[in-house]
Amino acid sequence: MCAGTFDIIHPGHLFYLSEARKYGDKLIVVVARDETSKTFKGKHPIHNEKERLEAVRMLKIVDEVVLGKQGNIFDIIEVIKPHVICLGYDQNVQKRQLEDELKKRGVKAEVIRIDSYMPHLYKSSKLKK
């Protein structure tokens, strides 16, 4: 499982998804809600959550795509119960904090941080300028 805003899909996202795909038989992608994205990034995405959901759904590498839950970002993890959670290199969640929260919730998932792919070129905040 991996998650993100996926506002303007670019090669960095594709790298993240393809690397995450290597860690399981099925790739489930959680697309952040508009309000969640605003909370974490300080602004609304260019594309709304339904548009971003559909864009990710069109990617052949993705087996399933869902919208995140409103409120607590961990609630969707309890629903999906993944074996592996892949974090992007620039996602602010600390691996150790995530592992502790998963343990509290009884979710047994390995947490992996995916390396960056040319972040000087492919980072959504840079592409939007």
Predicted regions: what they are:
Residues M1-K129:
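Nucleotidyltransferase catalytic core that binds NTPs
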